[in-house]
Amino acid sequence: MSDSFALIPLPLVDQRYAQALFDFVQEARSVENVEKAVASFLVVLDQHEDLKRFVQSPFFSIKEQIKVMRSVCENIKFADQGAGQILSNFLRVITVNRRLCALSGILQAFQHRVALSRREVSAQIISARPLSSHQEEELRVALEGVVRGKVLLHMCVDPTILGGLIIRLGSSQIDTSLVTKLSSLKLALKKEVS
């Protein structure tokens, strides 16, 4: 491993490894199966704090890390064993290259890359109270018209916004929340008074 590679910021490393995995599984025509295997692995990683700490720790040898990653992959019941093997081999490469600390970011970047290939976009919707399924569908259709692709909604309820919505789509944010409108009104009134 070259010293210059160690200086590359982790998000860029995430993207490069994710792209490499995506290119490989696309060639192997197993994108969907590997995507499911990655999702299964991320669920396990998210549920086990000890595993998260292990992945983040630089104090374990490569041999120990390889052994643990192999064991984790063997214990996950992947729907497709071939996809599980691809993921296991990929985890070994990451471990040997001392990038295990970036594992979560790499796998999330892979999921993002797969979504982009399908022209899917994630949108986070924050509302003061839960939206009805009809409202969610109308919102999804409106956003799909804007992005010209499939939109996956991630709903979140935050009563502190009082009303309205906050929509985060990529690097854009549309904030129509009542709390923001009240803050704007407060600032405008302060300007008028002074």
UniProtKB/Swiss-Prot annotation:
PANTHER family the UniProt entry points to: ATP SYNTHASE DELTA CHAIN (PTHR11910)
HAMAP family: ATP_synth_delta_bact
Keywords recorded for this protein, A-Z: ATP synthesis, Cell inner membrane, Cell membrane, CF(1), Hydrogen ion transport, Ion transport, Membrane, Transport
GO molecular-function term, one example from the UniProt record: proton-transporting ATP synthase activity, rotational mechanism
Organism: Bartonella quintana (strain Toulouse)
Location within or outside the cell: Cell inner membrane
Name of the molecule in the record: ATP synthase subunit delta
Role noted for this protein: F(1)F(0) ATP synthase produces ATP from ADP in the presence of a proton or sodium gradient. F-type ATPases consist of two structural domains, F(1) containing the extramembraneous catalytic core and F(0) containing the membrane proton channel, linked together by a central stalk and a peripheral stalk. During catalysis, ATP synthesis in the catalytic domain of F(1) is coupled via a rotary mechanism of the central stalk subunits to proton translocation. This protein is part of the stalk that links CF(0) to CF(1). It either transmits conformational changes from CF(0) to CF(1) or is implicated in proton conduction.
Record-linked Gene3D superfamilies: N-terminal domain of the delta subunit of the F1F0-ATP synthase
Membrane topology qualifier: Peripheral membrane protein
InterPro entries reported in the protein's UniProt record: ATP_synth_OSCP/delta_N_sf, ATPase_OSCP/d_CS, ATPase_OSCP/dsu
Subunit structure: F-type ATPases have 2 components, F(1) - the catalytic core - and F(0) - the membrane proton channel. F(1) has five subunits: alpha(3), beta(3), gamma(1), delta(1), epsilon(1). F(0) has three main subunits: a(1), b(2) and c(10-14). The alpha and beta chains form an alternating ring which encloses part of the gamma chain. F(1) is attached to F(0) by a central stalk formed by the gamma and epsilon chains, while a peripheral stalk is formed by the delta and b chains.
